[in-house]
């Protein structure tokens, strides 16, 4: 069983270590659309055995990322996730548990962010993956990802 999670993805533009929230916006230069995939049965087994989750979330083709990038401000318009042209989820930055600046600041405390690092912002929902489905992710009115599940 595989589940998909749509994301707004941030690209870092500079080296960042212990960046305060008020300066975090300076560390992001672009946003992209992403979808991550998780093998739920493998994840459940790893959790049950107290093992790492790597195999459940880090397999071949476990993530899709748009090639096109938009300016940082584009994320304020939010993202739309569609399956077979039906809107399944709208991701609004303002509805997230933590602000983007808080996420970037906190991550920079845990690890050094490097130029070009990608930050997949949390996804509110998961969707069961079915062969033959078409996925689209748009930020604002621009479709950045459009692919079929095979």
Language model feature labels by segment:
Residues 1-114, 118, 125-150:
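Catalytic-core "active-site belt" of small-molecule-metabolizing enzymes
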């Amino acid at each position: 069983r595989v589940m998909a999670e749509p994301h707004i993805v941030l690209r870092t533009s500079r080296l960042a270590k212990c960046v305060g929230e008020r300066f975090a916006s300076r560390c992001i230069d672009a946003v992209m659309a992403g979808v991550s995939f998780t093998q739920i049965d493998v994840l459940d087994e790893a959790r049950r055995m107290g093992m790492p989750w790597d195999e459940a979330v880090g397999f071949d083709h476990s993530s899709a990322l748009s090639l096109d990038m938009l300016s940082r401000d584009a994320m304020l318009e939010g993202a739309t996730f569609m399956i077979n042209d039906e809107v399944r989820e709208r991701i609004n930055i303002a509805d997230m548990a933590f602000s983007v600046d808080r996420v970037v600041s906190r991550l920079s405390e845990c690890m050094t962010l490097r130029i070009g690092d990608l930050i997949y912002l949390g996804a509110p929902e998961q969707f069961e993956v079915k062969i033959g489905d078409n996925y689209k992710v748009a930020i604002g009115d621009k479709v950045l990802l459009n692919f079929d599940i095979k």
